[in-house]
Amino acid sequence: LHMIHLHWYQYPPMNPMMYPLLLIFMLFTGILCLAGNFVTIWVFMNTKSLRTPANLLVVNLAMSDFLMMFTMFPPMMVTCYYHTWTLGPTFCQVYAFLGNLCGCASIWTMVFITFDRYNVIVKGVAGEPLSNKKAAMWILSVWVLSTAWCMAPFFGWNSYVPEGNLTGCGTDYLSEDILSRSYLYIYSTWVYFLPLTITIYCYVFIIKAVAAHEKGMRDQAKKMGIKSLRNEEAQKTSAECRLAKIAMTTVALWFIAWTPYLLINWVGMFARSYLSPVYTIWGYVFAKANAVYNPIVYAIS
């Protein structure tokens, strides 16, 4: 109880019907996420033709999503059943840490997937091909940096506290301490605004490169008096463009999933009077659903 901010005490308990609905949602998304990401990892790791450097990033994305749901699904089921957090303050902090860690690793893995598509499509033969060693270094850097940022609240830079709905835990966005808020400013930049900027930059040039390529193909076909000009190289480029669309869809879904949680953090800092326990539910509902999207998108591909 000492970890719960006074702001939440002004609100009555949530409608009891919310908890069964949350439990059903978590059961549905948990099973889908664990099964989907496990199949993704198994297929990519056991199919020789799919064991490419670029697909190592896909496997890492599936692993981060699988780890998120594997560690957060059981506690959520327990708290929804008892209508409150019953697992103690220490596990509350561990729970929040793992959620932030997997979310951070997920977004930066997708940033690297996007950058790889940019390198292949925009730079083409002039770009340095992605090697297994380079992909492994990218993956290692994702986890090391994500761990460093998410460990900070354990050392006094912000803290992990129960959410207002008492079914989960996260960063303390209600604290008015300047040091605590500075963590949220920097962390928001690190896991949201900077990745978004990089992603937009890459896709602007990817779209330009694809448009220029298609125009060149049409002009060449017109000169030769045929309807289309599709040789082996063109087919390869077309496949790369298809993969880029898949990656862009996945990144877009990720930002749709995590934007509500970002808004909750910022509303908590600057307009807390508008923030009720019910609203805090939507942040992690969208965030948890994100872990289901990725295996579906890549399975279709």
Swiss-Prot record:
GO terms for biological process: phototransduction; visual perception. The chain crosses the membrane at residues 19-43, 56-78, 93-115, 135-155, 183-204, 246-267, 279-300. Disulfide bonds join C92-C169. GO terms for molecular function: G protein-coupled receptor activity; photoreceptor activity. The modification N6-(retinylidene)lysine is found at K288. Residues 1-18, 79-92, 156-182, 268-278 are extracellular. Signal peptide: none annotated. SUPFAM superfamilies: Family A G protein-coupled receptor-like (SSF81321). It is a multi-pass membrane protein. Gene3D superfamilies: Rhodopsin 7-helix transmembrane proteins. Homodimer. Interacts with GNAQ. Belongs to the G-protein coupled receptor 1 family. Opsin subfamily. This is Rhodopsin. The lineage of its organism: Eukaryota, Metazoa, Ecdysozoa, Arthropoda, Crustacea. The gene is RHO.
